[in-house]
UniProtKB/Swiss-Prot annotation:
Species of the source: Streptococcus pyogenes serotype M18 (strain MGAS8232)
Protein name as annotated: Probable GTP-binding protein EngB
Ranges where the EngB-type G domain occurs: 28-199
S-S bonds: none
Family: Belongs to the TRAFAC class TrmE-Era-EngA-EngB-Septin-like GTPase superfamily. EngB GTPase family.
SUPFAM superfamilies from the UniProt entry: P-loop containing nucleoside triphosphate hydrolases (SSF52540)
Length: 199
């Protein structure tokens, strides 16, 4: 997709929720997956960059997304919201099922163009954040790291926090790193630039 203006980002809707590949949409539209810890702000990220308040439901209860949620954007692109990882109150068997479902999607879906890996800028990445980044690099899946909740940190400390995150991830300089805030609407254009570069 060459130009951002050809995509009406406000023309977006939730398409379907899927537990396995038999439920995936059967076409060749490009897909961007969104992965991150429970409550890292994935739903807020989706709502903010699409300019919609409640398209993706935000929840104060972590672990709410238990299926792959497919969002249709102007019939030209899809976002795929992946279940949040690292939520302790989910049973081991449920976590194993989610892991299997996520791995199947990420490694076998031809439509997948890139993964937006969301991390919390306030904290060093968790073990699961690092595992996800390593997994994507191992399978050579393009990754865009989006560091959320920047509004919770004074701007003068962003660089320091960014350095901590990058060091922990062993961040590849050829990947894109975006500082993001849904509250202050920071990083929206950079996110779209990075996404559209992949599709």
């Amino acid at each position: 997709m060459a130009e951002e203006q050809v995509l009406n980002t406000h023309n977006a809707s939730i398409l379907l929720s899927a537990a396995n590949k038999s439920h995936y949409p059967q076409d060749d539209l490009p897909e961007i997956a969104l992965a991150g810890r429970s409550n890292v702000g994935k739903s807020s990220f989706i709502n903010t960059i699409l300019g919609r308040k409640n398209l993706a439901r935000t929840s104060s209860k972590p672990g709410k997304t238990q299926l792959l949620n497919f969002f249709n954007i102007d019939d030209k692109l899809r976002f795929v919201d992946v279940p949040g990882y690292g939520y302790a109150k989910v049973s081991k068997s449920e976590r194993a099922e989610w892991g299997k479902m996520i791995e199947e999607y990420l490694t076998s879906r031809d439509n997948l163009r890139a993964v937006v890996s969301l991390v919390d800028l306030r904290h060093a990445p968790s073990k699961e954040d690092i595992q996800m980044y390593d997994f994507l690099k191992y399978y050579d899946i393009p990754v865009i790291v989006v560091a959320t909740k920047a509004d919770k940190i004074p701007r003068g400390k962003w660089n320091k926090h960014e350095s901590v995150v990058k060091k922990a991830l062993n961040f590849d300089k050829s990947d894109t790193f975006i500082v993001f805030s849904s509250v202050e609407r920071i990083g929206i254009d950079d996110s779209w630039d990075a996404i559209l570069e992949q599709v």
